[in-house]
């Protein structure tokens, strides 16, 4: 494991933080694609869950912009995708009519 700075990942993490702010705090759920707003039971809860997803993903990406290890490119994207799939499944089970 070595410490190096990957500026592209820092920019991507900052974009995730901006989206987390707008979705989680400002409740701008129009930024989320792939759902019908009329079918959502609790839009505030959806915004909070999606905001936490973007915040956690941004923190994970930011951490990985400073620390690199062997196999990082094969491990990190599937972990974030699996986390996202879990959030999507949870939202579809609990928040969609």
Swiss-Prot record:
The keyword Membrane applies. It comes from the Bacteria. It is found in: Cell membrane. InterPro entries: UCP037672. GO terms for cellular component: plasma membrane. Pfam families: DUF3784 (PF12650). It is a multi-pass membrane protein. The chain crosses the membrane at residues 5-25, 49-71, 75-92. Keywords: Cell membrane, Membrane, Transmembrane, Transmembrane helix. This is Uncharacterized protein YitR. It comes from Bacillus subtilis (strain 168). The lineage of its organism: Bacteria, Bacillati, Bacillota, Bacilli, Bacillales.
């Amino acid at each position: 494991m070595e410490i190096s700075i990957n500026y592209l990942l820092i920019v991507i993490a900052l974009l995730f933080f901006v989206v987390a702010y707008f979705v989680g705090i400002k409740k701008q759920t129009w930024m989320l694609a792939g759902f019908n707003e009329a079918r959502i039971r609790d839009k505030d809860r959806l915004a909070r869950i999606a905001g936490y997803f973007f915040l956690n993903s941004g923190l994970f990406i930011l951490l990985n912009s400073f620390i690199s290890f062997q196999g990082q490119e094969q491990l990190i994207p599937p972990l974030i995708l699996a986390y996202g799939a879990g959030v999507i499944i949870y939202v579809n089970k609990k928040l969609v009519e």
